Amino acid sequence: MSDCLLPSSDMDAFRKILKKANSVVILTGAGVSAESGVPTFRGAGGLWRTYSAQNLATPSAFRSNPSLVWEFYHHRRENMASKSPNNAHNAIAEFEHRMTKEGRHVSVITQNIDELHQRAGSVNVLELHGSLFKTRCLKCKKIEPNHDSPICEALRGKGSPSPNEVGELVPESLLPRCKVSSCGGLLRPHVVWFHENLDSAVLKKADEELNSCDLCLVVGTSSVVYPAAMFAPQVAERGVPVAEFNMETTAATHHFGFHFSGPCGELLPKALAP
């Protein structure tokens, strides 16, 4: 990208706009959680055993081998026990609390499934891709929060990422099961898999937030996963200031009024400070 196309990196100018904003949308992606040590399972080195996320995070993979897929997600859930919200998550949560006290509005729309925003204290969080800590019953369709560790006894000690530590598959009858009355249906992770559509109700709410905001922040996202990749450019098209915070420029950077390069955990505490 040539310099003439680069947006402003003037933090003082951004903060003047921030102080006047009444409704702020903060779009977050994997770059925010990466600073907490959360693996993305995308790109080089993003393997679990010998599988990529594209091999396991699909409806067909779950139909053919639910035990293997549950081991993968059990590993990811258990791995989160050692992870904590970082300075970026905390800065966003503190900003939301401060704005709420002043009668202003902040909404976090995240592509992440790790609930680190909520653990930091964010309240208005829309999870575009679901959550590692929610389940959905294939039989009754009930969605439930679930922070059990392990999620079921049969998965205790399972899910090692090492291809040398593969034990016997857990029988389907012992995988996580629905506890709603007498349902007993097989549970799946409540996450959006490859080849699945995003939840229409979540998209509708996101659209409402994006259409009513007067400032938008794009934080730690490569802006390549659709439909989220189009959210901020569409906000910019209606003349609303958009600021991107990322380690590098993206395919969408030229749409935005501001771009700040660097770790989100360093940039956001400065950008969102009182």
UniProtKB/Swiss-Prot annotation:
How are cofactors bound according to the entry's free-text note?
Answer: Binds 1 zinc ion per subunit.
Q: Where in the cell is it found?
A: Mitochondrion
- What is a single Pfam family found in this protein's UniProt entry? SIR2
Cofactor(s) needed: Zn(2+)
Q: What is its main location?
A: mitochondrion
Query: Which ranges carry the Deacetylase sirtuin-type domain?
Result: 4-274
Name the positions where NAD(+) binds.
29-48, 111-114, 220-222, 246-248, 264
Task: Report keywords, A-Z.
Answer: Metal-binding, Mitochondrion, NAD, Transferase, Zinc
Instruction: Offer a single GO CC term for the protein.
Output: mitochondrion
Q: What class of enzyme is it?
A: transferase
| UniProt EC number | 2.3.1.-
Write out the residues that bind substrate: Y73, R76
**Domain of life, per lineage:** Eukaryota
Catalysis: reaction(s): N(6)-malonyl-L-lysyl-[protein] + NAD(+) + H2O = 2''-O-malonyl-ADP-D-ribose + nicotinamide + L-lysyl-[protein]; N(6)-succinyl-L-lysyl-[protein] + NAD(+) + H2O = 2''-O-succinyl-ADP-D-ribose + nicotinamide + L-lysyl-[protein]; N(6)-glutaryl-L-lysyl-[protein] + NAD(+) + H2O = 2''-O-glutaryl-ADP-D-ribose + nicotinamide + L-lysyl-[protein]
Q: Which InterPro entries match?
A: DHS-like_NAD/FAD-binding_dom, NAD-dep_sirtuin_deacylases, Sirtuin, Sirtuin_cat_small_dom_sf, Sirtuin_class_III, Ssirtuin_cat_dom
The miscellaneous comment for this protein is:
This protein may be expected to contain an N-terminal transit peptide but none has been predicted.
What is stated as this protein's family in its record?
Belongs to the sirtuin family. Class III subfamily.
Q: Which comment does the entry carry about domains?
A: In contrast to class I sirtuins, class III sirtuins have only weak deacetylase activity. Difference in substrate specificity is probably due to a larger hydrophobic pocket with 2 residues (Tyr-73 and Arg-76) that bind to malonylated and succinylated substrates and define the specificity.
What this protein is reported to do is described as: NAD-dependent lysine demalonylase, desuccinylase and deglutarylase that specifically removes malonyl, succinyl and glutaryl groups on target proteins. Has weak NAD-dependent protein deacetylase activity; however this activity may not be physiologically relevant in vivo.
Output this protein's name.
NAD-dependent protein deacylase
| Native source species | Daphnia pulex
